Amino acid sequence: EVDAIVKGAINTFHPKEERFMVMSLGSGSACAIFNEGDILHAGGTGLGGGTIRGLSKLIIGEDDPKIINSLSSKGKKEKVDLLLKDVISGPIGNLPESASAVNFGKIDYSDCNKEDLAAGIISMVGQTILKTAITIASINDIKKVYVIGRSYKYDLLREMLIDGFRVINIEPLFHENGEYAICVGTI
């Protein structure tokens, strides 16, 4: 599967670099590195789109990705998460005061709705994916990240990836057909 991830990204994006990372965001998440022809599985997490769907079904009674995306786009994670500004009154290092300090730490069902809960779910999953990917990219001195799979189609998750990678001066690249990249990579 790791070869299919990288080969699919190469066939989808046609990168010019000899060294880059591919993030495959499916049911779980995987990071693979391409380095001058060599392919390495660099890590990942069991959190991904499957986690978003499972938690959404459990917490808000929805498991359709389009509905979850629509709900989360209207939600406010700050209604369910304690933010840095709530806990220590400001930013820490390069983390803004709006970063989550405690996922679901402010839950008050009288003050949040399905939209807020959906945003909190995607935020929690996205933070773990992002921290994993940033660590891998930093350790391996990666300058380009190509994102494939279907889970980046969640608007909030995609925004989190863009903002998070910006902190380490990397712009993640997405492709409208990125969800088919692994299939292309198996051919």
Which sequence ranges carry the predicted segments?
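Short, high-confidence coil segments that cap the C-terminus of an alpha-helix
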Residues: 17-18, 142
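Short glycine-aspartate micro-motif
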Residues: 19-24, 44
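Short beta-strand scaffold segments in enzyme catalytic cores
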Residues: 28-34
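Adenine-nucleotide phosphate-binding core of ATP-dependent small-molecule kinases
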Residues: 93-144
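A glycine- and small-aliphatic-rich helix-loop capping segment at beta-alpha/alpha-beta transitions
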Residues: 13-17, 35-40, 60-62, 161-168
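Glycine-rich phosphate-binding loop plus the immediately following alpha-helix
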Residues: 38-89
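Glycine-rich phosphate-binding/hydrolytic loop that grips phosphoryl groups
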Residues: 3-12, 52-57, 64, 170-187
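Glycine-rich phosphate-binding loops at beta-strand->alpha-helix junctions
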Residues: 134-138, 142-164, 178-179
